[in-house]
Regions:
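Secreted/extracellular ectodomain signature
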Residues: 14-130
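Bacterial N-terminal signal peptides
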Residues: 1-8
Length: 130
């Protein structure tokens, strides 16, 4: 199953690494995103989602957790690595539990937020809605 988010545009490195354009999430990308949203337990503590990077073809993902109240992650090197390895555009899909990929539906004033308490089906349905 491939979930598609129809989006338009390109990625701008002028301080904004949020992805734009057409995005097709593979099953593996969806599973990775769900794992990211829920947070893994590391050294007895559940990691807090910090940043999720994805390729526009949905075949490459990378994410970080933050063990502190606030973290500052520089996503630019990861976005560039993704683009080198895949040959397609890449960008930040989410920060914490908020989706930032620009698609016209997911507007600046009303970003899609994903709860870690949602079931897999609820998360998948929200991704399909976008």
């Amino acid at each position: 199953m491939v979930l598609g988010l129809l989006l338009s545009g390109n990625i701008s490195y002028a301080g904004n690494l949020n992805g734009t354009g057409e995005l097709k999430m593979s099953d593996q990308a969806v599973r990775s995103f769900i794992k990211y949203i829920r947070g893994e337990v590391i050294n007895g503590k559940r990691g807090k989602p910090d940043s999720f990077i994805i390729s526009s073809n949905g075949n490459w993902t990378w994410y970080w957790y933050c063990a502190y109240n606030e973290c500052w992650q520089n996503d630019k090197p990861t976005v560039e690595e993704c683009e080198r390895e895949t040959g397609v555009s890449c960008g930040r899909f989410a920060m914490r539990r908020t989706i930032y990929w620009d698609n016209g539906i997911n507007t600046r004033t009303k970003k899609a937020k994903i709860s870690s308490k949602w079931t897999d089906s609820e998360i998948k349905n929200e991704l399909k809605r976008l």
